[in-house]
């Protein structure tokens, strides 16, 4: 079930209450009124339509005349009943397009890379022995500043087994001795996994437009993300 505050599945963010309410409302309106439009198209009377309130949830409904629709051909019945799910699938593609061409580019403009978030440590490897508490953000590796994945890859490119290294994080510095890479014995390995790019608000954008802009862009992007997920789930 797609419910606020619950981890739906690994890899998906937690759904906020406001995103849930808005996503359900928008998708319900698209779904139900598509039934109504197709009913009118095939001259089936719509007995009632409107909005309903289920606790905090605002929903939409359309009620075609069952007697009239039962007299129509199977093709017409199928068209009317499938209009809602089909519309949800189509608008799902629209939401993907909005994310691809609008909200993701906006996120790239209002945020800047600011280190690598580590969410996992591998057993019996150097970083685990430091007792570093995950998650943590790597922002320095020896003399290299780490802003993104390329920085981290370049900083560890020449690391050999047995090399000493200083890993700078938001939770302090850790001194380690590189282990042997399990996939390439000539390469050093520190034993971190499950990376994510950490982001910080773009100070130029913040100073020009205000500190509310980056979180607002994130919020809007997540709305379209959940509209897409729920649309295809319903469709």
Model-derived features: where do they sit?
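Hydrophobic transmembrane alpha-helices and their immediate loop junctions
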Residues: 1-235
């Amino acid at each position: 079930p797609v419910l606020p505050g619950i981890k739906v599945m690994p890899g998906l963010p937690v759904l906020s209450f406001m995103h849930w309410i808005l996503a359900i409302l928008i998708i319900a309106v698209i779904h139900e009124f598509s039934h109504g439009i197709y009913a009118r198209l095939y001259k089936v009377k719509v007995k009632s339509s409107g909005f309903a309130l289920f606790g905090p949830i605002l929903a939409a409904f359309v009620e075609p005349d069952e007697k009239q629709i039962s007299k129509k051909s199977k093709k017409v019945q199928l068209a009317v009943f499938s209009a809602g799910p089909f519309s949800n699938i189509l608008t799902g593609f629209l939401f993907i397009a909005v994310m691809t061409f609008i909200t993701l580019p906006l996120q790239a403009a209002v945020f800047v890379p600011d280190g690598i978030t580590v969410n996992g440590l591998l057993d019996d490897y150097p970083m685990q022995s430091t007792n570093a508490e995950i998650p943590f953000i790597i922002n320095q590796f020896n003399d290299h500043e780490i802003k993104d994945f390329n920085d981290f890859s370049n900083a560890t490119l020449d690391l050999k087994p047995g090399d000493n290294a200083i890993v700078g994080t938001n939770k302090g510095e850790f001194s380690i001795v590189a282990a042997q890479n399990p996939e390439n014995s000539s390469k050093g390995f520190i034993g971190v996994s499950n990376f994510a790019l950490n982001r910080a608000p773009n100070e130029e954008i913040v100073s020009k437009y205000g500190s509310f802009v980056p979180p607002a862009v994130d919020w809007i992007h997540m709305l379209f993300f959940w509209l897409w997920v729920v649309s295809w789930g319903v469709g």
